[in-house]
Amino acid sequence: HYMGARVPDDAIAVMPNHFNLHGLNDYPEQFYPADLVTYAVSRGWYKPAKDGDFSDFDFAKAYQAEDEFFGPRNVMRQKNGLRIALDRPWSVEKEGMPFCIRANRPVTPQMMAEILSSHYEGTRDCCAHFGPGLSPHDASSIRYICTGTTLESDLFILRDDPKLTTVMSSFGRPCQLPYVALPPLLAQ
């Protein structure tokens, strides 16, 4: 069982290894199987507040492991990704953990590179006390966006004609290596 949605053209999604789709009708192009809710009920993952009324159904809460729903590691990733994307602090307590948000400025490859290479520098979440010879990739208790298990990072610049899509790859950790633009693979 699954749920998916298309990110609207004027929005940005920050998806940090946890479910962040919630209601059944949150987005115009949203997809899920017909038995999504009844399956969750049958498994004991969801009980409607009022019998037969599924308006309080939350996919992320029902289908995600209980200790992962609003888990600190993933909350920090989404919060800090949104902070960079919006150029303002993001309050999980007040603004939640949405699937996507309306972008308040153009999304650029530079902005995406900054998000994907982030160790939360300059915030309370930054673990700047690594010590001599250590790096943020050695932090075991904090899962940064760019972390110890990040092997490479890719950006895709989508075009109306899919054949003209440009791929940019860091070919390693994005905080250590620059993104290299690869020309459109099927350009004529």
Regions found by a protein language model. Give the residues of each.
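C-terminus-biased signal that marks the final domain/tail of proteins
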Residues: Y2-Q188
